[in-house]
Amino acid sequence: MNPKTSEYQKQQRYQENEILEHAAEILANRYVRGDALTNPDATKEYVRCKLGSYEREVFALLLLDNQNRLIEFKELFQGTVDAASVYPREVVKAVLEVNAAAVIFAHNHPSGDSTPSQADRRITERLKDTLALVDVRVLDHIVTGDTCTSFAERGWL
Protein backbone atom coordinates (compact mmCIF):
# COMPACT_ATOMS: atom_id res chain seq x y z
CA MET A 1 0.00 0.00 0.00
CA ASN A 2 1.25 3.45 -0.85
CA PRO A 3 1.98 5.35 2.41
CA LYS A 4 0.89 8.65 0.84
CA THR A 5 -2.47 7.18 -0.18
CA SER A 6 -2.98 5.75 3.29
CA GLU A 7 -2.17 9.10 4.91
CA TYR A 8 -4.55 10.86 2.51
CA GLN A 9 -7.34 8.42 3.37
CA LYS A 10 -6.77 8.98 7.10
CA GLN A 11 -6.83 12.73 6.60
CA GLN A 12 -10.00 12.55 4.50
CA ARG A 13 -11.71 10.34 7.12
CA TYR A 14 -10.70 12.80 9.85
CA GLN A 15 -12.18 15.71 7.87
CA GLU A 16 -15.39 13.75 7.24
CA ASN A 17 -15.71 13.02 10.97
CA GLU A 18 -15.24 16.72 11.76
CA ILE A 19 -18.00 17.61 9.31
CA LEU A 20 -20.32 15.00 10.85
CA GLU A 21 -19.60 16.32 14.34
CA HIS A 22 -20.47 19.86 13.25
CA ALA A 23 -23.64 18.61 11.55
CA ALA A 24 -24.60 16.77 14.75
CA GLU A 25 -24.11 19.98 16.73
CA ILE A 26 -26.32 21.91 14.30
CA LEU A 27 -29.05 19.27 14.50
CA ALA A 28 -28.72 19.05 18.28
CA ASN A 29 -29.31 22.79 18.44
CA ARG A 30 -32.45 22.34 16.33
CA TYR A 31 -33.75 19.68 18.70
CA VAL A 32 -33.41 21.28 22.06
CA ARG A 33 -35.41 20.48 25.14
CA GLY A 34 -39.03 21.26 24.44
CA ASP A 35 -39.05 20.66 20.68
CA ALA A 36 -41.69 18.21 19.47
CA LEU A 37 -40.42 15.32 17.37
CA THR A 38 -43.18 15.23 14.78
CA ASN A 39 -41.19 14.83 11.56
CA PRO A 40 -39.94 11.23 11.11
CA ASP A 41 -37.38 12.15 8.43
CA ALA A 42 -35.87 14.93 10.54
CA THR A 43 -35.78 12.61 13.56
CA LYS A 44 -33.97 9.93 11.54
CA GLU A 45 -31.45 12.49 10.30
CA TYR A 46 -30.92 13.74 13.86
CA VAL A 47 -30.21 10.19 15.03
CA ARG A 48 -27.91 9.55 12.08
CA CYS A 49 -25.87 12.65 12.86
CA LYS A 50 -25.72 11.85 16.57
CA LEU A 51 -24.69 8.20 16.18
CA GLY A 52 -23.41 7.80 12.64
CA SER A 53 -19.72 8.46 13.26
CA TYR A 54 -19.16 5.89 16.01
CA GLU A 55 -16.94 2.91 15.28
CA ARG A 56 -18.80 0.78 17.84
CA GLU A 57 -22.50 0.19 18.35
CA VAL A 58 -24.13 2.74 20.62
CA PHE A 59 -27.70 2.40 21.94
CA ALA A 60 -29.43 5.67 22.80
CA LEU A 61 -32.80 6.98 23.96
CA LEU A 62 -34.75 10.00 22.83
CA LEU A 63 -36.76 10.71 25.97
CA LEU A 64 -40.02 12.56 25.34
CA ASP A 65 -42.82 14.18 27.32
CA ASN A 66 -46.59 13.77 26.76
CA GLN A 67 -46.51 16.08 23.72
CA ASN A 68 -43.55 14.17 22.21
CA ARG A 69 -41.22 17.05 23.03
CA LEU A 70 -37.59 16.14 23.55
CA ILE A 71 -36.55 16.03 27.18
CA GLU A 72 -33.14 14.49 26.59
CA PHE A 73 -31.05 12.49 24.13
CA LYS A 74 -29.18 9.91 26.18
CA GLU A 75 -26.50 7.50 25.01
CA LEU A 76 -26.99 4.53 27.29
CA PHE A 77 -24.89 1.59 26.10
CA GLN A 78 -21.75 1.15 24.03
CA GLY A 79 -20.78 -2.20 22.56
CA THR A 80 -18.46 -3.70 19.98
CA VAL A 81 -18.31 -3.23 16.21
CA ASP A 82 -21.32 -5.51 15.71
CA ALA A 83 -23.28 -5.68 18.98
CA ALA A 84 -24.27 -3.75 22.09
CA SER A 85 -25.75 -5.25 25.23
CA VAL A 86 -28.96 -3.51 26.26
CA TYR A 87 -30.31 -3.91 29.79
CA PRO A 88 -34.05 -3.27 30.28
CA ARG A 89 -33.54 -2.30 33.93
CA GLU A 90 -31.20 0.54 32.92
CA VAL A 91 -33.58 1.70 30.19
CA VAL A 92 -36.49 1.86 32.66
CA LYS A 93 -34.28 3.71 35.15
CA ALA A 94 -33.25 6.31 32.54
CA VAL A 95 -36.86 6.83 31.43
CA LEU A 96 -38.18 7.25 34.96
CA GLU A 97 -35.34 9.58 36.03
CA VAL A 98 -36.65 12.28 33.67
CA ASN A 99 -40.32 11.29 33.96
CA ALA A 100 -40.56 10.56 30.23
CA ALA A 101 -43.97 9.61 28.84
CA ALA A 102 -42.59 8.23 25.58
CA VAL A 103 -39.31 7.07 24.11
CA ILE A 104 -37.64 6.48 20.78
CA PHE A 105 -34.83 3.93 20.76
CA ALA A 106 -31.88 4.51 18.47
CA HIS A 107 -28.69 2.68 17.70
CA ASN A 108 -26.08 2.58 14.99
CA HIS A 109 -24.65 -0.18 12.84
CA PRO A 110 -21.00 0.77 12.19
CA SER A 111 -21.00 -1.56 9.17
CA GLY A 112 -23.25 0.94 7.39
CA ASP A 113 -26.07 -1.61 6.89
CA SER A 114 -29.11 -0.29 8.76
CA THR A 115 -31.09 -3.52 8.37
CA PRO A 116 -32.29 -4.50 11.87
CA SER A 117 -31.12 -7.89 13.10
CA GLN A 118 -33.36 -10.45 14.80
CA ALA A 119 -31.64 -9.48 18.06
CA ASP A 120 -32.61 -5.84 17.41
CA ARG A 121 -36.23 -6.87 16.93
CA ARG A 122 -36.25 -9.08 20.04
CA ILE A 123 -34.79 -6.44 22.37
CA THR A 124 -37.19 -3.83 20.99
CA GLU A 125 -40.17 -6.05 21.76
CA ARG A 126 -38.79 -6.85 25.21
CA LEU A 127 -38.22 -3.17 26.00
CA LYS A 128 -41.65 -2.22 24.67
CA ASP A 129 -43.31 -4.82 26.92
CA THR A 130 -41.23 -3.74 29.92
CA LEU A 131 -41.97 -0.03 29.47
CA ALA A 132 -45.69 -0.72 29.00
CA LEU A 133 -45.71 -1.87 32.64
CA VAL A 134 -44.84 1.69 33.69
CA ASP A 135 -47.09 3.38 31.09
CA VAL A 136 -44.30 4.62 28.81
CA ARG A 137 -45.01 4.55 25.07
CA VAL A 138 -42.39 3.31 22.61
CA LEU A 139 -42.81 5.39 19.45
CA ASP A 140 -40.01 4.02 17.31
CA HIS A 141 -36.64 2.29 17.12
CA ILE A 142 -34.34 3.85 14.55
CA VAL A 143 -31.31 1.93 13.30
CA THR A 144 -28.76 4.07 11.53
CA GLY A 145 -25.96 3.20 9.15
CA ASP A 146 -25.49 4.67 5.70
CA THR A 147 -29.28 5.15 5.80
CA CYS A 148 -31.86 4.85 8.58
CA THR A 149 -34.45 2.16 9.22
CA SER A 150 -37.53 2.92 11.31
CA PHE A 151 -39.35 0.10 13.09
CA ALA A 152 -42.52 2.23 13.15
CA GLU A 153 -42.41 2.80 9.38
CA ARG A 154 -42.04 -0.94 8.86
CA GLY A 155 -45.05 -1.62 11.10
CA TRP A 156 -43.01 -3.49 13.71
CA LEU A 157 -44.26 -1.55 16.72
UniProtKB/Swiss-Prot annotation:
Belongs to the UPF0758 family. One of its GO terms (molecular function) is metal ion binding. GO terms for biological process: proteolysis. A motif (JAMM motif) lies at residues 107-120. Zn(2+) binds at residues 107, 109, 120. Gene3D superfamilies: Cytidine Deaminase, domain 2. Keywords: Hydrolase, Metal-binding, Metalloprotease, Protease, Zinc. This is UPF0758 protein VC_0510. InterPro entries: MPN (IPR037518), RadC_JAB (IPR025657), UPF0758 (IPR001405), UPF0758_CS (IPR020891). Residues 36-157 form the MPN domain. PROSITE patterns: MPN, UPF0758. It comes from Vibrio cholerae serotype O1 (strain ATCC 39315 / El Tor Inaba N16961). The keyword Zinc applies.
